[in-house]
């Protein structure tokens, strides 16, 4: 018999899971998400979260509490009489009373192979650290930071070509399927939980804009990982002088390339930039106030001569 669920999520990453659960016949009693934020032109309109948009399209009641710590919030949560809650990038801490409210517990989809990369930015940090693989896990939540017992996991290799955006989209799709499988097992009474290992714990700190500047004095593979791990947001950037003007360019994609030179120096007309060892060839970038563009299109309108310095 399908489960009666509360779904709790906010960004695009959570949308595939909501759609898959609804599509597999589970009853979504309510969707909890963050409140709309000012946006649009001049920031005058209130913009709903991606999850709120999808929930309303599906006709599911939406709840946007400022906190879950009040007795009023707990009473409202309990009133849904859910079998379980599914939590995907909700963005708010769930107190123990909320975790205890659904009959079968609360289950979180986390975008890493726990206990590695607990915390806010597991996708970015996995790429930036040069991990060979990552994945998604379904865990039964406790009050700790991503410390709950693991129910299911799916692994995914990380290639040199993957950006955080690429990995985000793949893990969102894989994770949606994984959560559907987990809820099916929970429904049958056959969901097995395994404690996380004590060894190998790392934390994925929130990405700060201050760390986005590219350090060309690092090896080429580290520069590539930095660029791809921060693409598209906040976007790894570097400054260069074009037509006598200092310009900040976000570099969104690159590839390892042969070549040597002073770190930060352009070494050919294909926008290949030297690093401490080796080089990277820029394949996609973004100028301030402009949209992303292929490097080839950028070079058709802007001459970037060998010897030009990025820094």
From Swiss-Prot:
Residues reported to bind (6S)-5,6,7,8-tetrahydrofolate: 112-115
List, in alphabetical order, the Gene Ontology terms for molecular function in this entry: methionyl-tRNA formyltransferase activity
What keywords tag this UniProt record? Protein biosynthesis, Transferase
The record ties this protein, via InterPro entries, to: Fmt (IPR005794), Formyl_trans_C (IPR005793), Formyl_transf_N (IPR002376), Formyl_transf_N_sf (IPR036477), Formyl_transferase-like_C_sf (IPR011034), GART_AS (IPR001555), Met-tRNA-FMT_C (IPR044135), Met-tRNA-FMT_N (IPR041711)
Going by the record, the broad EC class of this enzyme is transferase
E.C. no: 2.1.2.9
Which catalytic reaction applies to this protein? Answer: L-methionyl-tRNA(fMet) + (6R)-10-formyltetrahydrofolate = N-formyl-L-methionyl-tRNA(fMet) + (6S)-5,6,7,8-tetrahydrofolate + H(+)
Task: Give the similarity note.
Answer: Belongs to the Fmt family.
Query: By its UniProt entry, which NCBIfam families does this protein fall under?
Result: fmt
Which purpose does this protein serve, as stated in its record?
A: Attaches a formyl group to the free amino group of methionyl-tRNA(fMet). The formyl group appears to play a dual role in the initiator identity of N-formylmethionyl-tRNA by promoting its recognition by IF2 and preventing the misappropriation of this tRNA by the elongation apparatus.
- Record protein name field: Methionyl-tRNA formyltransferase
